[in-house]
Amino acid sequence: MQIYDKAKKDRRNKDLLNIMKKHKVKLNFQKSQDETWGVVLDSNNKNATILFQKCDNPAASLAHELLHIITQLNGYKKIELWTSPKLDTEDFNILMAALDNELQHHKFYNQFISYGYKDKEFYVDSDKYTEIILRPKINSYIKSNNISLIKIIPDFLTTIGKGGHISEESKKEIIELFYSINNNQYETQLKNIGLIKKNGV
């Protein structure tokens, strides 16, 4: 039995899977190349490929991806990635992908919890190390004195995201560190990003 078969049998996912049937969405499963789970929904909203990997909470991981699908079925339009000769498109597209992902998370986090899952099950297993990884990165941003806003926003979004292993107390402390980058040059922009995300735009 594949790990996703076990996840599909979890009673907490029954309603989510029924929604897939209602919308006639065919679920295909493909092993991920890394530790993460993910999903790609085709333009017709009829075929979804769920990337899976062995993890501690496969049922929660499946629920997470099904909620991504449902969010899009309910009208959410994914942010399109693009290229431009005037921008560092790699950094820009990393930013857009992170923003798109976090906006969807904001929309369905409460649903995830309502199905009986815990906030610490919202992300991949390695999320438990996110704070350990984040702090040295932020310190390097602070020391650089010339880091661009576009490079720090993905990590900022990770910090202010709902759920996960970072405590609220630590989040507040880390957010203040972000504000201090480049002598508080980006504080206003980062606060505005936080407000947009809080209000669910």
What are the residue ranges of the model-derived segments?
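Short, structured coil/loop segments at alpha-helix boundaries
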Residues: 1-17, 58, 87-93, 115, ...
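Pan-zinc metallopeptidase signature
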Residues: 126-201
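Post-HEXXH active-site segment of zinc metalloproteases
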Residues: 60, 71-106, 194-201
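Active-site-proximal or metal-binding-adjacent scaffold patches in catalytic folds
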Residues: 79-82, 90, 97-98, 102-144
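Hydrophobic/aromatic-lined pockets within catalytic cores
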Residues: 71-75, 112-117, 161-162
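Histidine-centered divalent metal-coordination motifs
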Residues: 64, 68
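Auxiliary, metal-adjacent structural segments of Zn-dependent hydrolase domains
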Residues: 1-45, 55, 94-102, 106-121
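Short pre-active-site segment immediately N-terminal to the catalytic Zn-binding motif
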Residues: 46-62
